[in-house]
Amino acid sequence: MSSELKVDTISEKTSNNGVELKGYKETDVAVTSSSGVIAVDMTGGNTGAITLSENITDIDFTNVPANGTSSFTMKVTQDGTGSRTMAINAITVNGGGNVTGLTPGAAGLTLSTGANDVDLVSFLFFDAGTPLINSLLDFS
């Protein structure tokens, strides 16, 4: 497995002695769905996009780092029909059993429903555990 860090500048002189990145970008990975299941392989990156053509009943993440914090941001676009849904009660992480993603106030996840609507859904993992999910809806 090879990793590549692309930055224009890395500076160690920051006010909190952390590393400052300039010119940072993330690599998109392919996000696919089949028979209502979204498959996300985080080996190659932490962002991806999908246009929904069916209701999603299961989201399967693979290669989520077992230690530390990691995230995945998914651009979700409704197809020309719209009204597609994404369930978060059957999420698997690295081949484990189904878990229900955690959302603010236990409100669940409701996507925008209009044809061609665009939402951003973020998944945050601590030690490859149950994802914390947040969304930004209805970009237009």
Kindly label every feature range from the protein language model.
Residues V37, T51-S140:
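Acidic, glycine/polar-enriched metal-coordinating patches/loops
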